[in-house]
Amino acid sequence: MNILRRGRLGSNVKEDVMKFTTSLEFDKEIFESDILCDIAHTTMLVEQNVISEENGKKIIAELKKIAEQSMESLNLDPSLDDIHMVIESELIKELGEDVAGRMHTGRSRNDEVATDLRLSLRKKVLEIITHLIAMEKNMLRVSREHKETLTVGYTHLQQAQPVTFGHHILSHVSAIERDISRFFDTYNRINISPLGCGAMATTGFNLNRKRTQELLGFYDLIENSMDGVSSRDFVVETMANISMLGTNLSKICEELVVFSSAEFNTIEIANEYTSTSSIMPQKKNPDVAEITRAKLSTLNGELVTVLTIMKALPNTYNRDLQEISPHLWKSVYTLIDSIQMVDGMISTVKVNKERMKENAEKNYSTATELADTLVRECGIAFRMAHGIVGELVKRSIEEKVEIKEIILEVLEKNNLSLSQEKIDTALDPFENVKLRNVIGGPAPKEVERAISSFNEKISSHKEKLDEKIAEIESVKKNLLK
């Protein structure tokens, strides 16, 4: 029986109510964090002379024994509500209530669970960043391999201008970079301590909140006790980051599906990320990209669900907040799995260079550079050049002739002239690419510079990541030693 009920409520509780309200199913995500929180709190209680050193040592020793077990080995009776009471009941069973019952002095489950969530989530955020860095490294490798692989870029899914496949890959790297930065920023807001806020008004015991902050490796305190127990904005912020990253990854999945189709035929997804048809033996379907795309879509739904749960809740703690947790952890694991799938598909993709080159050489992808050449060489306004080249394209389509066959005629009609060398250069897609050597352009030299710049950022990220991982590992080591 839940020891909390014996006073005010009595032992009579319906089984279906217990099963409906328990959080034990998803409390496995905070099991270790709860023990670390208990040890830190107990250590501080001893130091502040709130409980005796003898009792504190007994409690901490038993907590360390529990930490060595799996959560499943404990008595997960739904009547205990949650992992906090499971652990406390385990302590009482081993030490007796007069000793174990002192651990919760000056603390509520409200500030306890808020602390546990932050401890567990900060670790998962670093895991996400770890996977993103690994994926970014692989994307940069592919980009370098294809910094001179000519292809065509699209707007409105219509062929637009010549680029390189390496430059195209870097467009996704650039977005992933912002995602990594967002997670690092969010980490700083996750890693602040609500422990000591109590139920919602702190406590009359002489607690040292700064000490538990230090023991648990938090960067700062949430000072206001009401905000400390009720705030879940760090969850929403993390899930918003997850949703944004999921959107970026879904774009990659979409391209893998579209560009691997027979109509595009510019890439081929590795066999291990595809399946075939039960009836059509020729099929090679991009199932992993499709399933990943679908799973990433669910992240938006999880975010909206959490926002809806939180909307208009009374200050401060409400049990509604419990229902946020399963949506958070589902989002985290869906994202991590999806990153690994996208990473694998990009790392093993086969590139059809001939098909990419063929696409870049047709459908007037060099028209912009031809207009730019008229501006540079003839001194006319760009809008005028735009109209002249537009006329060239129209006649080429209608008369079924190449632009180079009619360009001199059109230029002469407009009292303009260009050398054949300038015309050939303007209409050559790879020359187009080489000309675009400005920052962020597709020229191979600029792509190489950008790759080097991104690698420097990765090194900086890795250094920061390793530092934070070491901080967390140090907390665990010191508390469980």
Curated annotation (Swiss-Prot):
Gene Ontology cellular component annotations, sorted alphabetically: cytosol
EC nos: 4.3.2.1
Superkingdom of origin: Archaea
Any one GO molecular-function label of the UniProt entry: argininosuccinate lyase activity
GO-annotated biological processes: arginine biosynthetic process via ornithine; L-arginine biosynthetic process
Any Pfam family hit: Lyase_1
Keyword rRNA-binding among record annotations: no
Major localization listed first in the record, in broad terms: cytoplasm
Location(s) in or outside the cell: Cytoplasm
InterPro entries assigned to the protein according to its UniProt record, in alphabetical order: Arg_succ_lyase_C, Argininosuccinate_lyase, Fumarase/histidase_N, Fumarate_lyase_fam, Fumarate_lyase_N, L-Aspartase-like
Catalytic activity of the protein: 2-(N(omega)-L-arginino)succinate = fumarate + L-arginine
PANTHER family: ARGININOSUCCINATE LYASE
NCBIfam families: argH (TIGR00838)
Family: Belongs to the lyase 1 family. Argininosuccinate lyase subfamily.
Name this polypeptide is given: Argininosuccinate lyase
Species annotation: Methanococcus maripaludis (strain C6 / ATCC BAA-1332)
